[in-house]
Amino acid sequence: MNYLVMISFAFLLMTGVESVRDAYIAQNYNCVYHCARDAYCNELCTKNGAKSGSCPYLGEHKFACYCKDLPDNVPIRVPGKCHRR
């Protein structure tokens, strides 16, 4: 039984783990991408590795691109202010 656990763990380490998340994609300085159409967000999100994107008009950030299944290496909007220069 222990061998099975060790082999499974080794296989997991060899293959790597890629996780995804649903979030607002962020520009520099923690700013969202503003939008007016779903097509713009869908193109932006899929170009960055997401499954799809939309431009919701309700929610925390109104008229901002929201991506489904966005990879971990792409920046997302985190709590705090947008710090534009």
UniProtKB/Swiss-Prot annotation:
Its main location: secreted. Keywords: Disulfide bond, Ion channel impairing toxin, Neurotoxin, Secreted, Signal, Toxin, Voltage-gated sodium channel impairing toxin. Residues 1-19 form the signal peptide. InterPro entries: LCN-type_CS_alpha_beta_dom, Scorpion_toxin-like, Scorpion_toxin-like_sf, Scorpion_toxinL, Scorpion_toxinL/defensin. The keyword Disulfide bond applies. Transmembrane segments: none annotated. Residues 84-85 form a propeptide. GO terms for cellular component: extracellular region. Disulfide bonds join C31-C82, C35-C55, C41-C65, C45-C67. One of its GO terms (biological process) is defense response. Gene3D superfamilies: Knottin, scorpion toxin-like. Pfam families: Toxin_3 (PF00537). Expressed by the venom gland. GO terms for molecular function: sodium channel inhibitor activity; toxin activity. SUPFAM superfamilies: Scorpion toxin-like. It is found in: Secreted. Residues 21-83 form the LCN-type CS-alpha/beta domain. Belongs to the long (4 C-C) scorpion toxin superfamily. Sodium channel inhibitor family. Alpha subfamily. Alpha toxins bind voltage-independently at site-3 of sodium channels (Nav) and inhibit the inactivation of the activated channels, thereby blocking neuronal transmission. Shows a high toxicity toward insects and moderate toxicity against mammals. Exists in two forms, due to cis-trans isomerization at 28-Asn-Tyr-29. Adopts a predominately cis conformation. Has the structural arrangement of an alpha-helix connected to antiparallel beta-sheets by disulfide bonds (CS-alpha/beta). This is Toxin BmKaIT1.
